A protein has these predicted regions:
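Cytosolic Rossmann-like ligand/nucleotide-binding regulatory domains
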Residues: 466, 471-517, 521
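Short, compositionally biased
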Residues: 521-529
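Alpha-helical transmembrane segments and immediately membrane-proximal extracytoplasmic
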Residues: 1-450, 456, 465-466, 490-493, ...
């Protein structure tokens, strides 16, 4: 009899487990597994697009460098100058037709993920971004590869979400996965690629987002490692200076103050000049003429400063100059050139120019330390790497990404601890200086641009997670912000009437809200789901 009672209780548990919710949760696990496999596919496709993008930039830079290093006769410069000018005029025409391909790409990706922007023709725009970024770089401008790679990845994510007919609320997961894979392809840094999505694009730590971006980043990073087996940053030799703890903290504090002040100047100048440039009424071909002229003059002086200046930074970190004034002059020249290039709105990122400026600033600080006997010449590269990380924190305000990225691409874990300390102090000082992150400024400029057609009402899709705040709640019981309304609940391929519906994990909830509330409500609503 006792055995029969136990069997009956067990059967009751099985019946309770085999409820709609129980089966539904198991079904969701299968859906999640599918999403993770699809995100790896997104990473593979992104790698197959973004890595060739990186390779072509690398090839064209060395082709251009070889031309200027050969010191050709003066008449050979005329066709190259005119060709570069024509290239930029063509790219500006492309940007005029498709405004979303202009600039870096991180603000655009954020806008697509939070629902403010829609990629209407993702394949055409992706090809245009690819071609526009390569042509802008080949003209010698100081632009980076990371922003376009991130946006290319988001285009791939958008295309795959259409091909696979994935759920509406999961589309942003593939967009985020593609964006992370793009950065991984640009730097072969999968961990940092996941962090930048969380810190700068998604701006919210969701487990599913972290997993999808990490999986996609690992696959894209593997593709990048196959094409670029030797990471040039690994060739930088680092020797850590030996200090007593409190002496070390003192120098870290000084470096953080210097980086914070310079970062404030860097960001303010970039923002101010971008607005001034937009107000100049000269035709695009006139603006491009002066831009090519500046790029050409710098190419004649120091060709390694073109293309973002990454090659110049690597050369300085491995066997750099010891002349403080010369390095300072070059840093200022690179900064002015980067301001002109980034403000043009041509396809290309500002990530690498920012890293280069931070590295050269660190070299100056290191050389001053050598002159006064604080450190040895062999320690300068150590200061450069720490300064690169901190300067990225100051300008972009992504401390985790900056710290992990420098550690990951260089392979020098001895810079991790000082990067954490100096980066943390820099973050605090930039908050005191009331600095706005550069990507936030770019995003705000984008959504207020004349070409941006703003709708009055937008729809945000969120997926209900297990044990979240909204899990198990009746829609009628929810107290949402004013003019924020749930218009549809999608479950198991069916659209349910919101009134009277109890939310369960996996539900795709569509929320309509005013346009001015998207940025304010996106993070709270996603966190509730």
């Amino acid at each position: 009899m006792e055995l029969w009672d136990k069997a009956e209780r067990l059967w009751t548990r099985v019946k309770n487990w085999k409820t709609v919710r129980g089966w539904h949760i198991w079904k969701l696990k299968l859906v999640d597994a599918r999403l993770y496999f699809v995100s790896m596919f997104v990473g593979l496709l992104t790698g197959l697009v973004a890595v060739p993008y990186h390779y072509l930039l690398y090839y064209l830079f060395h082709l251009r460098s070889g031309f200027f290093a050969s010191h050709p006769a003066w008449y050979w410069h005329i066709p190259l100058f005119l060709f570069s000018w024509g290239i930029l005029v063509f790219v500006m025409w492309l940007v005029g037709k498709m405004p979303l391909i202009g600039g870096g790409g991180i603000p655009q990706t954020r806008g697509v993920i939070n629902g403010r922007i829609t990629y209407r023709h993702p394949f055409i725009e992706m090809v245009s971004k690819f071609v526009g970024g390569i042509l802008s770089f080949s003209a010698g401008l100081s632009l980076g590869r990371e922003g376009p790679s991130v946006q290319i990845g988001s285009y791939v994510g958008s295309l795959v979400s259409r091909w696979t007919h994935i759920l509406k609320g999961e589309q942003k997961q593939l967009l985020a996965a593609g964006a992370g894979a793009g950065l991984a392809a640009a730097f072969a840094a999968p961990l940092a690629s996941s962090l930048i999505v969380i810190e700068s694009i998604e701006r919210f730590d969701a487990p599913k987002t972290a997993i999808t971006t990490l999986l996609a980043g690992v696959v894209a990073g593997a593709v990048a490692s196959m094409v670029f087996p030797v990471n040039p940053y690994h060739l930088i030799e680092v020797t850590e200076p030996v200090f007593a703890f409190f002496v070390q903290v003192k120098y870290f504090l000084i470096l953080a103050v210097i980086v914070s002040v310079c970062g404030k100047f860097y960001s303010s100048t970039m923002n101010a000049f971008r607005h001034v440039y937009a107000k100049v009424n000269s035709p695009a071909y006139v603006k491009m003429f002066y831009l090519v002229l500046v790029a050409y003059i710098i190419s004649l002086m120091q060709v390694n400063l073109t293309g973002g200046g990454e090659q110049f930074l690597l050369a300085q970190a491995q066997n750099g100059s010891t002349q403080i004034m010369w390095v300072t002059a070059v840093m200022l020249l690179h900064f002015v050139f980067s301001v002109f290039s980034v403000s043009s709105g041509l396809p290309g990122g500002s990530f690498i120019p920012t890293l280069v400026t931070g590295g050269l600033l660190g070299q100056i600080v290191g050389l001053v330390g050598v002159r006064y006997g604080v450190i040895g010449q062999e320690n300068v590269s150590y200061i450069m790497l720490v300064s690169m990380s901190a300067f990225l924190v100051a300008v972009v305000r992504t401390p985790l990404t900056a710290i992990v990225l420098i550690t990951e691409i260089t392979g020098h874990f001895e810079v991790f601890y000082p990067s954490v300390v100096v980066g943390g102090l820099t973050y605090y000082f930039t908050e005191l200086l009331q600095m706005k992150p550069s990507n936030v400024s770019l995003y705000e400029d984008m959504i207020h641009a004349p070409y941006f057609k703003e709708e009055k009402r937008y729809t945000l899709s969120v997926e209900i997670m297990t044990d979240s705040y909204l899990d198990g709640k009746l829609v009628d019981e929810l107290s949402l912000p004013e003019r924020c309304v749930i218009i549809n609940v999608h479950r198991d391929g069916k659209n349910l009437v919101p009134a009277g519906t109890r939310l369960i994990p996996g539900d795709q909830v569509q929320i309509k809200m005013d346009s001015q509330d998207i940025e304010k409500l996106y993070e709270p609503l996603v966190s509730m789901a």
